[in-house]
From Swiss-Prot:
Pfam families (UniProt xref): KRAB
Source organism, top-level taxon: Eukaryota
Expressed in which tissues: Expressed in brain, ovary, testis, prostate, tonsil, heart, bone marrow, colon, breast and kidney.
Record-given protein name: KRAB domain-containing protein 4
Gene, per the UniProt record: KRBOX4
Alphabetized SMART domains for the sequence: KRAB
UniProt cross-references to InterPro entries, sorted A to Z: KRAB, KRAB_dom_sf, Krueppel_C2H2_ZnF
Length: 171
């Protein structure tokens, strides 16, 4: 059986709920959904899918605004309604953001270059790592000056298993 070699996108692994379906989920199910979507996204990033974190990860559900605005407060709630699950999840997102620096899947791959780690020590790698954040501006600032923003994102970020093995042998 021949398998397709098409690239996956976040939409391919994204589960969409109707507003009615979303409202029937309890807070534990909503948290599980968020965790699974974050994991799906992290897997795509780990294989070279370079894009800002989709807003859907930081949303309560279809038709609702992002959970976080400037400073991490919910953007929209019903008038006079306290939404404790929003605040609870907001705290979890803060914890997640704090732990992001420790997660290996944050790196996306740009090209073969010599890198300097945070201590300034050079190392030869097969792909240049760019550490992602939830904002494109942060990624843009970390791109080398000789990469144009447009060129970097039009470039294919596919890294086949055979190339990966070859890179490991070169180290």
């Amino acid at each position: 059986m021949a398998m397709s070699q098409e690239s996956l996108t976040f939409k391919d692994v994204f589960v969409d709920f109707t507003l009615e379906e979303w409202q029937q989920l309890d807070s534990a199910q909503k948290n599980l959904y968020r965790d699974v979507m974050l994991e799906n996204y992290s897997h795509l990033v780990s294989v070279g899918y370079l894009v800002a974190k989709p807003d859907v990860i930081f949303r309560l559900g279809p038709g609702e605004e992002s959970w976080m605005a400037d400073g991490g407060t919910p953007v929209r709630t019903c008038a006079g309604e306290d939404r404790p699950e929003v605040w609870q999840v907001d705290e979890q997102i803060d914890h997640y953001k704090e732990s992001q620096d420790k997660l290996p899947w944050q790196a996306a791959f740009i090209g073969k270059e010599t890198l300097k780690d945070e201590s300034g020590q050079e190392s030869r790698t097969c792909r240049k790592s760019i550490y992602l954040s939830t904002e494109f501006d942060s990624v843009r600032q970390r791109l080398p000056k000789y990469y144009s923003w447009e060129k970097a994102f039009k470039t294919s970020f596919k890294l086949s298993w055979s190339k990966w093995k070859l890179c490991k042998k070169e180290r």
